Amino acid sequence: MELGLGGLSTLSHCPWPRQQPALWPTLAALALLSSVAEASLGSAPRSPAPREGPPPVLASPAGHLPGGRTARWCSGRARRPPPQPSRPAPPPPAPPSALPRGGRAARAGGPGSRARAAGARGCRLRSQLVPVRALGLGHRSDELVRFRFCSGSCRRARSPHDLSLASLLGAGALRPPPGSRPVSQPCCRPTRYEAVSFMDVNSTWRTVDRLSATACGCLG
């Protein structure tokens, strides 16, 4: 088919579509931005995943456990039990009732007490430390010696003669010689003696026989 001139002129005047710009630079820029974003997100610290395991066991409160044991804290010290309320002190015992005069007199004058009193007042051997210079024997010494002597009453050892003599003197029926008075009871005197030794100021040993008593008795 042949085209006329008019057709050519029509084709020559139809506008041709213009060439679109290339999209490759834009796509490349977008890819670069996405890679940078992924890199920044990958470098951020991640919290470690929690480990799976048995739950922690909580310490039981301190206190008394079955069997008399006591729970302990982590420090190893046992918790003291709460203080118990103090109990009131028991009342003091009631004082014994007062004894009548007769009972007290009977108790005070019992045979045991009378025997002890008589033994304390009776003739017996006694002992005491004394200085040698005080013996009156003329020895010069700075030492102390054990001096034993007899002392006490002998009223329970009086004979019928002693009892009669005391009665006559008390009634005035017996006139003793002037300047003297008879003794109406025995005397507590030593019955045995022992020697005593000591050192004088010249470092010389001295011994005195029959100086200290070893036994006593009522004589006379």
UniProtKB/Swiss-Prot annotation:
Residues 47-58, 81-98 have a biased composition (Pro residues). CDD domains: TGF_beta_Artemin. It is found in: Secreted. Disulfide bonds join C123-C188, C150-C216, C154-C218. GO terms for molecular function: glial cell-derived neurotrophic factor receptor binding; growth factor activity; receptor tyrosine kinase binding; signaling receptor binding. SMART domains: TGFB. Residues 40-107 form a propeptide. Pfam families: TGF_beta. Residues 41-121 are annotated as: Disordered. One of its GO terms (cellular component) is extracellular region. Residues 99-121 have a biased composition (Low complexity). The keyword Secreted applies. Glycans are attached at N202. It comes from the Eukaryota. Ubiquitous. Expressed at high levels in peripheral tissues including prostate, placenta, pancreas, heart, kidney, pituitary gland, lung and testis. Expressed at low levels in the brain. GO terms for biological process: axon guidance; glial cell-derived neurotrophic factor receptor signaling pathway; induction of positive chemotaxis; lymphocyte migration into lymphoid organs; neuroblast proliferation; peripheral nervous system development; Peyer's patch morphogenesis; signal transduction. Residues 1-39 form the signal peptide. InterPro entries: Cystine-knot_cytokine (IPR029034), GDNF_fam (IPR043401), TGF-b_C (IPR001839). Homodimer; disulfide-linked. Interacts with GFRA3 coreceptor and RET: forms a 2:2:2 ternary complex composed of ARTN ligand, GFRA3 and RET receptor. Growth factor that supports the survival of sensory and sympathetic peripheral neurons in culture and also supports the survival of dopaminergic neurons of the ventral mid-brain. Acts by binding to its coreceptor, GFRA3, leading to autophosphorylation and activation of the RET receptor. Strong attractant of gut hematopoietic cells thus promoting the formation Peyer's patch-like structures, a major component of the gut-associated lymphoid tissue. Belongs to the TGF-beta family. GDNF subfamily. This is Artemin.
